[in-house]
Amino acid sequence: MKRCGLKLTHDGGVAVLDGRDLVACIEMEKLTNNERYRRIEHTDEIALALHRSGFQPSDIDEYIIDGWDGEVDAWVELLGAAGRVQLKVAPYVEKEPDRANEFTQGFGLNILGRDYTYKSAPHVMGHIASVYCTSPFAIFKQKALCLVWDGSIWPRLYEISDGGIRFINTLFPMIGHAYACAGHHFGPYKNADRTSWKLDLAGKLMSYMSTGTVDSRITAAIQTSYQNNLAGHSPNALSYRRMSANTSVALIQTHRFFEEIGVLVAGAPEHDILATFHYFVERLLIETLRHELARAGRNMSRNLCISGGCGLNIKWNSALRSSGLFRDVWVSPFPNDSGSAIGAACSALVANDGLVPINWSVFSGPHLVKSTPDANWRGSACELSELAALLADGEPVVFLAGRAELGPRALGARSILAPASDRSMKDRLNAAKQREYFRPVAPICLEDRAPEIFEPGSNDRYMLYDHKVREGWRDRVPAIMHLDGSARVQTIARTSAHPVAKLLVEYEKLTNIPLLCNTSANALGRGFFPDVASACTWGRIAKVWAENVLWSNDVDARIP
């Protein structure tokens, strides 16, 4: 059975499951230097993504479209051969608590002139299916809890077991977009717009909050506003909770929440307000989960899956993992909507086969497209050992290898790599990427040596937790250390067949340092570079490596 999952709205993507094997997931932003978060605009793009994955539209046995905004049913719009069409899809959240995987049936998906029927699962179900079916819990047929916290919903807790998927409770009445909304009121990204948000804002704020300090006076003000506007018994709070499925109402009330905070702590440093808000929500997550576990007793699983856009918050993930509440915590490398096409396909798999694991690799994105840079760039043969020597001499390199990563993190296939031993390298990379000074640069590290350098230094292959840099290494690898002494670590086995692992081994031989700086290889506001020519046209790093060829441009004025 070949299933094709489709995410038509922002973070558009096309995923193909052949039986239980993930063949590919093609995210629109990772094609032709598209804008980040790009939706699927035309059904021809579905055909193109399938072609890149080795399929024709007629090869697919079942199409599944991700659900979207709507209390009962929802509609998504896209262009086709006959013009603009609206497709009926499932709502964002399941209609009934015990029917998480109930499908909406549809027709009229026209691809290359042929109509296909489809079905659609609730958006939240896609998050549940994608995270559980990729987890170690599924492999060992273990029960698990699943925390789903996405932009437009409150954090929702489910239990996954042989009996299926059971909704337990919402943890507290705050939408995931509250994090981005905070940035409209405080900090360097303030914006008077109260009707929308930028999808990249939450990640930037997570970096900026490390410049602030948690303040007890601000905590008290946040608690007061939280009760007055979201969780308490005031008319505004009660009305907000009654209309929780209305995204416009939720957004308006969330902004009122921050407006009152601003009044209560007028004059307080804004980076402290943001840092305190972050910690306030972190404690809410831990304490409400503690309450649910205590209420259920020993029968509730102590395995936790985290999904939804808030699953990209590495500090919350780390706090939950270290809380002592859970035996194990799993976050997939695509917890946000970049994994929704996979989730849609997995929803149909679960409906047919049960809660089974899929066979998958994080390197299942688009293949590197063959291209030739312009005449200003010179290509020469370059083995990984030679590239390691170049890095050891202090040069950053755009590193392109094989198929792209799934999800938003560059994990060594579409990366800019650089030595971490020079403190100025972080500033150099941030300048090349046109980013603010407080933005961190992550390390990619050989996993057997990670505990030597980081606390806890555990095996974290997808850059979804933060670690503290140990004192003895802070001066040896300063470029990967964030302002608060942390690092968003990605580990990789030295025995991995991936070229980036082999490069790290060669670099370690030369320097006795088992890590490099790793940041995404992309132009500002765009997805990963799809080919060498794109990286060279961007031109803000003078060296580009792919398939054992090093392309060099030592004279371009764009290079900072």
UniProtKB/Swiss-Prot annotation:
Record's keyword annotation contains Manganese: no
Cell division listed as a keyword: no
Keywords: Nodulation, Transferase
GO biological process, one term: biosynthetic process
Transmembrane stretches, start-end: none
Signal peptide region: none
Domain of life: Bacteria
UniProt-listed Enzyme Commission number(s): 2.1.3.-
Pfam families found in the cross-reference section: Carbam_trans_C, Carbam_trans_N
UniProt record similarity statement: Belongs to the NodU/CmcH family.
Task performed by this protein: Involved in 6-O-carbamoylation of Nod-factors.
Name recorded for this polypeptide: Nodulation protein U
Lineage: Bacteria, Pseudomonadati, Pseudomonadota, Alphaproteobacteria, Hyphomicrobiales
